[in-house]
Each structure stands twice: as C-alpha cells, then as structure tokens.
C-alpha cells in the first residue's frame, strides 16, 4: 500500500478575520474547520515580495503555483529589475555596458524605447530613469527617448504626469531628450496590424509624422482633438529649425525597457531582423549592432537580453521524479496549466513517473451559474486513484473559490466554498485511510473578499494570508512562512533531501 503525500491547493481561499463580504468565513465548512482545529496549522504570505512581486501587490495563480512548485521565491520581471536597481547590479549589467561602450566609441546615440508609465504591467518608468542615470554616469552625451504612451494600464489621460516626471530626471542628470511620442495602440500592437507599427517606425527612423516642439505640446494637441494617450499618433519632436531632435541611424544603440514580451515583439522585430518582410521599411534601414531587450522577448527577435530567463532547476516535480517516486497532477481545465506547466517551473513535459488527469470545466458563460464547477468529477477521479495505490505524491487544485470568486457575488461564492469543503473532506478521508498525509493550502486569496466597503462586487484577488495545514499530529510548524516554503516541507515529510536550488525553508520544525 502506498502512503500518499498530497498537496491540496484551494485556489483563491484566503483567510480574513472580518466576516463582511467574506464568503470563506460565511460558508459552512465543517471539514476545513475540523482540520484547522485538530491538526498543526499556520498561515503563509502569498503576495508581494514573498512571491517575487512588488511589495503590496496581490498574488495570482500563475505566480502562486510557480513559487510553490519551485520551493523558492521566483522573482517576476518587474521585481527582478527593481531589486537589481536597488542592489546596484543594474548598472553593472553587461548588455547595458556593451551598448554604452559601443555608442561612446563610435560617437553615436543611445535610444531608449518603452511604455512611459508606472503601470508595472509591461514596463515601469523607473527602469527608464535608471537608464538615464546610468547613461549620465557613464558620460553618454546623446540619449533620446521614444516614449510609448499608456492610457490602458493607467488612467486614459495621465501622460502629462509621466512626461513631467521624465523631465525632472532629465534635469537632474543632464542627459536625455524626447525624440518621438506614440500611443501604445501603434507602438505595442501584438495582432499583426503592421500598418500601426509602420507609422511608429517611420517616425523613429525617418522623422515622418506630425511634428511638435515638445512632448507636452504633442499631448495637448492630441487631447484637443479628442485623442487620448493610448491612441496618440506617432509624432516627431523637432528643434527650433523644424528638424527632428533625433532619428535612429546606423551604429546607434537601442535599449527597449519593456519587460513583458507580448507587446514588444513586433516593434523589436522591425529593428532587429534583417529578413523582416511584414512591410517595406524603405531605403533607410539602420544597422543597430546593439539592440538590447530588457527580457527575452522571443526567438523571433534578434536582440541582446539584459535579464535572461531564470532556469528553474530542481523544482518539486523534478526532485520527486529523481527520488523514483510516482506523482499525479490533477485539476479541471481552468487550473490544469497551473498544476502542470507553472508548478513545473515553466516546463511543458512530464517528468518520469508523472501522470496527469485533466477534468473538463463546465461549459457555462460564467461560473457563478455553476459554483460547483467540475469539483465532484475531479474528486471522484482522485479518490479512485488513491484507492488504487498508484501515486506517492499528489498535486491537486480545486478551482472554485477563485473562479467563482471572480464574479464578486456572495451567494455563488459561498456555494463554491461549501462544495470545496465537501470535496476536501472526501479527498482527505481517502488519504488518511491509506495512512497518508495531506498538506492543505492556497495560492492566493479571492473568495475572502467579495464586496468592497461600499457593497460593490470585489472581483480581484486579495493580499490576505492563506492557510497551511498538515494532517499529521506529530509535527510542529513555524510561523512566518511563504509559498516557496511548501515544497521543502513536503520533501521533509517524504524523507527526500532538499536540493540547494530550492532556497525555501521548510515550515516543519
């Protein structure tokens, strides 16, 4: 008989004292409450820097499963760059230094591309400010800014405040000038609408497009015509004599400071790929030997990468496989990628001895119409696997508290919590009957806050702590744990040595 060690992830099940708008607290959940009272338990931090996000930012399912499976804090791109700036590593980055060396030796210009806002989804203007300060420190004289206006991840008419903030840094450092301005609708298309990207390219390379004496004038004129940040036409900033402040020329260098790839790929390809055929670039196609992308955008972009992908070696799944143990990953459609791809550190392939079970999520418009989703089918399939003694390690996700929680509707979400509790009982009972151990936790909160203080639906995730219960009475748990500490604790229970790459600390004392 196998004694399974199961990790049960109650997606979106956070803990909060206040019962108002709290579907987790208001639901009848005798199984969870019983385990909480009977077995060793604690809470874990599932948001902010504890999961590699900026301080105070709510967690999400992708990040949660990545951290849990990796057994360490997996820094997301925004935080990774922030930490590099804070710790002084940013200025030493080899790709930045190489681009700077190139323009200084050749007497050419450094161009900074990117989304100018503090939205933090595709970019952060603080990263561009760090580049301006670096250029000033290294004595680069010609630095030009090609600002992509946001209006989508931030308010629709906020560009002026970001231009003002940039001008402050230009004043402070003595380097940098705006060269072109364009709305992200043009510069950051991802749907192969190449006519939009072409307008942007022609402004940057040929100085073609509406001309303005300043970035401020460009924005004011656009607003006067009812065109707001996202949709500002690619425009050229000109000197007093109406010549462009700068265009992109041979041997110039570019640093593209967006860190999220999807909307950066197309415009990057126009500049980096010699075989580019999506539109005719015209006679002037500048040769850019140093085109630096903040992160790895795509195999289709021939540029240098400042922050290379982090290889997550020795995730929980890999370590379990190396120990010769059999593992099962099981979830319904909505969370299947999370218990497989994300849990395995961004790996699609199965490990040796890994089995996967996918149960289809119900075909309904929104899950508040069917709060139980496919939880009973998932549970039946899993209990059957446990009874057949097939696996040493089980990774299970129950999707309901998150997927129904996104509706912001109390009644359906309470039903989702209650269905989750019912099935949690069945699974834990089956595990205990085999003398196994269950670790019950969540990846982030959601169902714990369904209403705002005004009584409006709250559809987002929360920053509340998540539970951690071990159904074994002879263990002691420490306080202050994070999601990255779960895998080390599981390895402790399995009697498998924790690899050095796994920097989380076991929650089991």
UniProtKB/Swiss-Prot annotation:
EC category: isomerase
Domain of life: Bacteria
Pfam families cross-referenced by the UniProt entry: iPGM_N, Metalloenzyme
InterPro entries tied to this protein: Alkaline_phosphatase_core_sf, BPG-indep_PGM_N, Metalloenzyme, PGAM_B_sf, Pgm_bpd_ind
Gene3D superfamilies: Alkaline Phosphatase, subunit A (3.40.720.10), BPG-independent phosphoglycerate mutase, domain B (3.40.1450.10)
Molecular-function GO terms, alphabetical: manganese ion binding; phosphoglycerate mutase activity
Binding-site residues for Mn(2+) 1, renumbered to this chain: 402, 406, 461
Segments forming a coiled coil: none
Keywords: Glycolysis, Isomerase, Manganese, Metal-binding, Phosphoprotein, Sporulation
Manganese is among the record's keywords: yes
Pathway noted in the entry: Carbohydrate degradation; glycolysis; pyruvate from D-glyceraldehyde 3-phosphate: step 3/5
Paired cysteines (S-S): none
GO biological process: glucose catabolic process; glycolytic process; sporulation resulting in formation of a cellular spore
Cofactor: Mn(2+)
Cofactor binding note of this UniProt entry: Binds 2 manganese ions per subunit.
Keyword Magnesium: no
Binding site for substrate: 122, 152-153, 184, 190, 260-263, 335
Catalytic site: 61 (phosphoserine intermediate)
Subunit details: Monomer.
Protein name, UniProt field: 2,3-bisphosphoglycerate-independent phosphoglycerate mutase
């Amino acid at each position: 008989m196998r004694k399974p060690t199961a990790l049960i992830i109650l997606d979106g099940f956070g803990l909060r004292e206040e019962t108002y708008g709290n579907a987790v607290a208001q639901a009848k959940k005798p199984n969870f409450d019983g385990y909480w009272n009977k077995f060793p338990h604690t809470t874990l931090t599932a948001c902010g820097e504890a999961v590699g996000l900026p301080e105070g930012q709510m967690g999400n399912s992708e990040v949660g499963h990545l951290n849990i499976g990796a057994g360490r804090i997996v820094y997301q791109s925004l935080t990774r760059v922030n930490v590099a700036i804070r710790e002084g590593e940013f200025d030493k980055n080899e790709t930045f230094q190489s681009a700077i060396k190139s323009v200084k030796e050749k007497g050419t210009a450094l161009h900074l591309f990117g989304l100018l806002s503090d939205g933090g989804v595709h970019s952060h203007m603080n990263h561009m400010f760090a580049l301006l300060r670096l250029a000033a420190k290294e004595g680069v004289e010609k630095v030009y800014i090609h600002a992509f206006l946001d209006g989508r991840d931030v308010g629709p008419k906020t560009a002026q405040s970001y231009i003002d903030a940039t001008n402050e840094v230009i004043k402070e450092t003595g380097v940098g000038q705006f060269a072109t301005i364009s709305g992200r609708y043009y510069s950051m298309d991802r749907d192969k609408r190449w006519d939009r990207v072409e307008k942007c390219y022609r402004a940057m390379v040929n100085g073609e497009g509406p001309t303005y004496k300043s970035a401020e004038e460009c924005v004011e004129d656009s607003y006067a015509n009812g065109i707001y940040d996202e949709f500002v036409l690619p425009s050229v900033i000109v000197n007093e004599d109406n010549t462009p402040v700068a265009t992109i020329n041979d041997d110039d260098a570019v640093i593209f400071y967006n860190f999220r790839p999807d909307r950066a790929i197309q415009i990057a390809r126009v500049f980096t790929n010699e075989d580019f055929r999506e539109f005719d670039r015209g006679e002037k196609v500048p040769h850019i030997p140093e085109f630096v992308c903040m992160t790895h955008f795509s195999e289709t972009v021939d540029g240098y990468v400042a922050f290379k992908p982090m290889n997550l070696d020795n995730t929980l799944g890999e370590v379990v496989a190396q120990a010769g143990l059999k593992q099962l990953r099981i979830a319904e459609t909505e969370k299947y990628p999370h218990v497989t791809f994300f849990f395995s550190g961004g790996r699609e392939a199965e490990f040796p001895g890994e089995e996967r079970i996918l149960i289809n999520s119900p075909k309904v418009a929104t899950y508040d119409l069917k709060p139980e989703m496919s939880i009973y089918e998932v549970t039946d399939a899993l209990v059957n696997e446990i009874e057949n003694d097939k696996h040493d390690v089980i990774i299970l996700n129950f999707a309901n508290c998150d997927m129904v929680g996104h509706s912001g509707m109390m009644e359906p979400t309470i039903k989702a919590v209650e269905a989750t509790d019912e099935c949690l009982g069945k699974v834990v009972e089956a595990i205990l009957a085999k003398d196994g151990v269950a670790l019950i936790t969540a990846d982030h909160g959601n169902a714990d806050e369904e209403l705002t203080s005004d009584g409006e639906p709250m559809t987002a995730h929360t920053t509340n702590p998540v539970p951690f219960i071990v159904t074994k009475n002879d263990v002691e748990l420490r306080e202050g744990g994070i999601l990255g500490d779960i895998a080390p604790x599981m390895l402790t229970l399995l009697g498998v040595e924790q690899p050095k790459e796994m920097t989380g600390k076991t929650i089991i004392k």
